[in-house]
């Protein structure tokens, strides 16, 4: 469902670019709808040349991940030498497999060169954790919620996720998970009408 929303339904209905304008946000890294699995699936769906690039040796690998030209990636630690920072998102524009080099273009049009050792600073960013999304905004946000996320289903996490979307927010998954997230406030109280609005559309 998440892949179809990102690849087809949202772009077709709202004219939003799947690669540059839609961000999947998920509470966890490991699960069927965690960042690791969603990035694997979304990369395969949104980069149709992935299999060919792998067969022809036109990709780079780092920590079990495959990078190809066009990939959406996130810097996951501060790198003062390259002037890139934890949470910066960009797109792979060039790969040199013989030299083990990759170029990433960031939002401000800067192009940053990574060698094979520096690739460990990058992760695929088709899906990112809600925590990593703090401080960012996206045209459209897709948030999968399941009971696999049970320990993390809190109102403040849901609030962070849905307030990242500027134009469109899509919640997809188990209504029971959404009900729990609305109900569980944890230690943080926010005075917004989000919980009331979500309760109004949830089946009782």
Predicted regions located by residue number:
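Conserved helicase motor core of P-loop NTPases
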Residues: 1-82, 93, 201
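C-terminal accessory regions
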Residues: 74-78, 86-204
């Amino acid at each position: 469902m998440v892949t179809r929303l990102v690849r087809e339904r949202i772009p077709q209905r709202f004219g939003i670019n799947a690669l540059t304008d839609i961000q999947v946000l998920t509470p966890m890294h490991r699960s069927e709808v965690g960042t690791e699995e969603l990035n694997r699936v979304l990369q395969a769906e949104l980069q149709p040349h992935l299999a060919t690039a792998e067969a022809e040796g036109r990709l780079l690998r780092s920590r079990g991940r495959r990078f190809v030209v066009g990939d959406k990636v996130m810097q996951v630690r501060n790198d003062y030498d390259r002037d890139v920072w934890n949470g910066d998102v960009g797109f792979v524009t060039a790969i040199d497999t013989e030299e083990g080099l990759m170029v990433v273009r960031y939002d401000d049009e800067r192009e940053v060169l990574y060698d094979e050792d520096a690739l460990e600073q990058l992760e695929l960013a088709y899906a990112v954790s809600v925590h990593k999304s703090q401080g960012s905004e996206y045209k459209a946000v897709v948030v999968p919620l399941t009971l696999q996320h049970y320990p993390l289903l809190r109102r403040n996490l849901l609030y962070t996720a849905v307030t990242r979307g500027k134009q469109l927010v899509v919640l997809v998954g188990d209504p029971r998970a959404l009900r729990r997230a609305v109900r569980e406030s944890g230690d943080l109280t926010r005075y917004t009408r989000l919980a009331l609005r979500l309760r109004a559309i949830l089946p009782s």
